[in-house]
Swiss-Prot record:
It comes from Cupriavidus taiwanensis (strain DSM 17343 / BCRC 17206 / CCUG 44338 / CIP 107171 / LMG 19424 / R1) (Ralstonia taiwanensis (strain LMG 19424)). Homodimer. Belongs to the peptidase M20A family. DapE subfamily. GO terms for molecular function: acetylornithine deacetylase activity; cobalt ion binding; succinyl-diaminopimelate desuccinylase activity; zinc ion binding. It catalyses: N-succinyl-(2S,6S)-2,6-diaminopimelate + H2O = (2S,6S)-2,6-diaminopimelate + succinate. The keyword Glycoprotein does not apply. Keywords: Amino-acid biosynthesis, Cobalt, Diaminopimelate biosynthesis, Hydrolase, Lysine biosynthesis, Metal-binding, Zinc. This is Succinyl-diaminopimelate desuccinylase. It is an enzyme of class 3 (hydrolase). Binds 2 Zn(2+) or Co(2+) ions per subunit. Its cofactor is Zn(2+); Co(2+). Catalyzes the hydrolysis of N-succinyl-L,L-diaminopimelic acid (SDAP), forming succinate and LL-2,6-diaminopimelate (DAP), an intermediate involved in the bacterial biosynthesis of lysine and meso-diaminopimelic acid, an essential component of bacterial cell walls. NCBIfam families: dapE_proteo (TIGR01246), PRK13009.1 (NF009557).
């Protein structure tokens, strides 16, 4: 069997729902140690949410003076959803119609397998490679991400480790392998707004104050606000409400408060501080009695065209024929953490149409070319 496909299937068999790793990283560590990597496990998190992280590095002939290319990814997967809706066991890799089915097939165990086999081939072909190679793997990307990649980044930063390039194996392709890569991601800023009123009988509104009515004009203004125009790399910043909770459940009671959850997906044209200030200004203008708690999920990051993007684009062109599109669309990724210690971060992986869905899959015809692209990046940057 093709070694990349075989490793992908082995990883899919592991029921590694966040934060469980279920031995995936042990498989990777064994293979990486066999080709000269130094491997370090970093376990963190509370007892009921233990996260497994792996940092592995193989120095090139230039030592720490040479460039360091890191492959980053996650072994954890999202829950399966209703098992009865799957056409096969999500943790038993299954082939149908030229596709490999299983939870994590697209997001992102195929990419991790491609990383490993590409590096094995590269090291065999270039035993005296000049630059260094690293792996940063976590079991907490699909979850809260408090004890995953960010903890490894903090540890590496504390010891002065410098990363020059990072390829994250997120499933970035759309219709075919290589048609899109991500050279940045928007930031995420969430707010929990509680507007206070005075509870009373709905027939006597003059005896209370309806917080839903109070909040509505301000929410309408927030929804209509143009936060920025975006720029050549990012679309305009968006503000969206996700949840509104108010009332006691009774139809004859004006509630005492209403809570609204909202989220910004923001570009490099805005800052968290600036967005917060503008929200508070709008709320204050409406004279609301409110509290507002903020959570910064991640800053935006951007890798302009440079050595990594050119190497990846060239490798994709050579393998697939595509002139790949650089994009910053989609949700957040662990790139938001890695960008703190690495100036060039790009994501590339298989098509993403089935990720997080019932019957997640990857087309088998894309597996070997994916590995070849990763090897092509190694050849172009650190051989």
């Amino acid at each position: 069997m093709n070694p990349t496909l075989a490793l992908t299937e082995d990883l899919i068999r592991r029921r590694s729902v966040t934060p469980a790793d279920e031995g995936c990283q042990a498989i990777l560590e064994t293979r990486l140690k066999a080709i000269g990597f130094d491997c370090e496990a970093l376990v963190s998190g509370p007892d009921d949410f233990r996260v497994t992280n792996l940092w592995a590095v193989k120095r090139g002939t230039q030592g720490k003076d040479g460039k360091l290319l890191v492959f980053a990814g996650h072994t954890d997967v999202v829950p399966t959803g209703p098992l009865e809706q799957w056409h096969s066991d999500p943790f038993a890799p299954t082939h149908r119609d030229g596709k490999l089915y299983g939870r994590g097939a697209a997001d992102m165990k195929t990419s991790i397998a491609g990383f490993v086999v590409a590096v094995e081939e590269f090291v065999k072909a270039h035993p005296a490679h000049a630059g260094s190679i690293g792996f940063l793997i976590t079991s907490d990307e699909e979850g809260p991400a408090h004890d995953g990649t960010i903890k490894v980044v903090e540890a590496l930063s504390a010891r002065g480790e410098r990363l020059d390039y990072c390829v994250i194996g997120e499933p970035t392709s759309v219709n075919a392998l290589g048609d899109m890569v991500k050279n940045g991601r928007r930031g995420s800023l969430s707010g929990k707004l509680t507007v206070k009123g005075i509870q009373c009988h709905i027939a006597y509104p003059h005896l209370g104050r309806n917080p839903i009515h109070d909040a509505a004009p301000a929410l309408a203004e927030l929804a209509a606000e143009v936060w920025d125009a975006g720029n050549e790399y990012f679309p305009p910043t968006s503000w969206q409400m996700s949840n509104i909770h108010g009332g006691t459940g009774a139809t004859n009671v004006i509630p005492g408060h209403v809570t609204i959850d909202f989220n910004f997906r923001f570009s490099t044209a805005s800052t968290p501080e600036g967005l917060k200030a503008r929200v508070h200004a709008i709320l204050d203008r409406h004279s609301l009695d409110y509290t507002l708690d903020w959570t910064l999920g991640g800053e935006p990051f951007l890798t302009p065209r440079g050595e990594l993007s050119e190497a990846l684009s060239s490798a994709i062109k050579a393998e697939t024929g595509f002139d790949t599109e650089l994009s910053t669309t989609g949700g957040t990724s662990d790139g938001r953490f890695i960008a703190r210690i690495c100036p060039q971060v790009i994501e590339f992986g298989p098509p993403n149409a089935s990720i997080h869905k019932i019957d997640e899959h990857v087309e088998v015809r894309f597996i070997e070319p994916l590995k070849n692209v990763y090897r092509g990046v190694l050849e172009r940057l650190i051989a």
